[in-house]
Design a protein with these regions (language model features):
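Surface beta-loop-beta hairpin patches that serve as ligand-binding interfaces in beta-rich domains
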Residues: 394, 402, 409-411, 415-474
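Extracellular beta-strand repeat scaffolds in secreted/surface proteins
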Residues: 39-43, 383-388, 445-448
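Sec-dependent N-terminal signal peptides
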Residues: 4-13
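Short, compositionally biased
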Residues: 54-65, 111-113, 454-464
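Beta-solenoid repeat scaffold
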Residues: 20, 37-45, 49-76, 83-94, ...
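Right-handed parallel beta-helix/beta-solenoid
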Residues: 16-30, 37, 45-47, 71, ...
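Glycine- and acidic/polar-rich repeat regions and solenoidal domains
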Residues: 52-53, 79-86, 98-124, 128-409
């Protein structure tokens, strides 16, 4: 009996997770040789200058390995510091990259070289701020996601002021299934050229491969590096429940097909060049979104649908086909809907076989719809437009009636229930809730918000409900 108890006790000692406190990269390297599932590697508080950290280990689903700050936010990485995360079931928590820069690659990379990528791993509660090269033409990323099933959440990314996308999902021959959520992206100045995206999912070369990445519940404030705030370049991705404030650009479905964009808020606050969603490609669905006070036009319109290039190569513009734009609300935008943008001798294919249904469009600023090129075989139904001139000959499916928009808690809500409540046309079974997460049944309300008193599940994101838990914003 005593022998059995001794063996059990010994097993518990062996299985008990350990904590390793480290003060430099040599100590981290040494710990990586003996770290086991469930262990924690704790970085000592203070300045870590020119620290090239390699977190190369393998945890398990039940027992991930964690690399964390002694106190969240108190480990300051600067100079030429960087981090590579390589292995399965790893967590990085509470780091603060502040005021340094690197020469190439990425500040945080979910791989170690090209041989070992990271899977089922997480970057959380971390800051990268002002990590800018003195030469603004030098291109490196802040976060590069490789592998599969990784998550970046509750991080703060501020003031990337040089060339290169901030966060990139890199594709391979198998889907990624990454999750990017609850982050605060802030203050990206206009670069004056391409390469200033906040998030890019894929590349032109891989744009017809599936990624299944989800970007949700993030807050984007004054992210204006270029015309594409988010650049989709792959297939089967979802962009939902994000909030964009004073961003001079658009969530752009640049390459790839069959993506969903729903439950997002776009607030322009009447700032020049602020935009919403731009559609390129096939099979996209844009629904349950709210667009307010956006001042952009053309590719920066609240909703723009592009022309395409015949026999387009992967890096140009594929014709828009079979898109659905439904149950959105547009309020006080300078250019609410523009169709066929970019039309010229090369971009000669107008959008075809698309549906515009059950949207509320209200504005007194400019024409509600602009056809730069004439769309082909569009289906319009159940829409309520009011305010300015329609801008096109009514194709049917647009009622010119006042929805009586009233501002309630920073959002404009229709008060004329007689023309919107239970008045949606058509059968859109894939839409089962509204922008708030309230249930939609067969008798749906026009616009993004279902009339009723049910609890609101999804609210606009802001600087207080995104980003690191330890970082307080006024």
């Amino acid at each position: 009996m005593k022998k059995t108890l001794a063996l059990i006790f010994l097993s518990l000692i062996i299985l008990k997770a350990e904590e390793f406190k480290v003060s430099n990269t040599d100590e981290i390297k040494s710990v990586m040789k003996k770290v086991q599932p469930g262990d924690r590697v704790i970085l000592a508080n203070g300045e870590w200058k020119d620290a090239a950290i390699v977190f190369d280990a393998d945890g398990t689903k039940e027992k991930p390995i964690t690399l964390c700050a002694e106190i969240s936010g108190k480990v300051i990485l600067n100079g030429n510091s960087s981090l590579k995360i390589a292995g399965d079931y790893l967590i990085v928590d509470g780091l603060n990259f502040l005021g340094g820069y690197i020469e190439k690659g990425a500040v945080i990379e979910f791989r170690n070289g090209t041989k070992k990528e990271s899977n089922h791993s997480r970057l959380t509660n971390t800051v990268i701020e002002n990590y800018n090269h003195p030469d603004k033409t030098v291109d490196y990323k802040w976060v590069s996601l490789y592998g599969t099933h990784n998550r970046v959440d509750h991080c703060y990314f501020r003031n990337k002021a040089y060339q290169g996308c901030l966060l990139v999902v890199w594709l391979s021959d198998k889907p990624n299934y990454h999750l990017i959520d609850s982050n605060y992206f802030a203050y990206r100045p206009d670069l004056g050229n391409n390469g200033g995206e906040i998030i890019r999912v894929g590349t032109s070369d891989w744009s017809m491969y599936p990624s299944y990445t989800v970007v949700e519940k993030n807050y984007f404030e004054q992210c204006s590096g270029e015309r594409e705030i988010i650049s989709n370049k792959s297939v089967y991705n979802t962009y939902r429940y994000n909030t964009f404030v004073e961003c001079q650009g658009a969530l752009t479905l640049r390459h790839g097909n069959n993506c969903d964009v729903y439950g997002n808020y776009f607030f322009g606050n009447n700032v020049k060049g602020t935009g919403g969603v731009r559609i390129i490609g096939e099979g996209h669905k844009v629904y349950n979104n709210y667009f307010q006070d956006l001042e952009g036009e053309d590719a920066f319109s609240a909703l723009s649908i592009m022309n395409g290039v015949p026999n387009s190569p992967l890096n140009r513009y594929f014709q828009v086909k079979n898109a659905v734009v439904a149950f959105n609300t547009f309020v006080n935008n300078r250019h609410s809907i523009e169709i066929g943008i970019g039309k010229n001798d090369e971009l000669s294919l107008p959008p075809i076989n698309c549906t515009i249904a059950n949207n509320i469009v209200y504005s007194t600023k400019g024409k509600l719809v602009k056809n730069v090129d004439e769309p082909q075989n569009f289906k319009w139904e159940g829409n309520v437009f009011f305010g300015s001139e329609l801008g096109i000959a009514n194709p049917g499916g647009i009622e010119i009636k006042d929805p009586q928009m009233k501002k309630i808690h920073d959002l404009f809500i229709p008060q004329n229930s007689a023309i919107v409540q239970n008045k949606a046309a058509g059968n859109y079974d894939f839409i089962v809730e509204d922008i708030d997460g309230q249930k939609r049944d067969q008798l749906k309300t026009v616009g993004c918000d279902e009339m009723g008193v049910a609890k609101r599940i999804h609210l606009p994101m802001n600087k207080k409900n995104t980003g690191p838990f330890w970082l307080k914003h006024d």
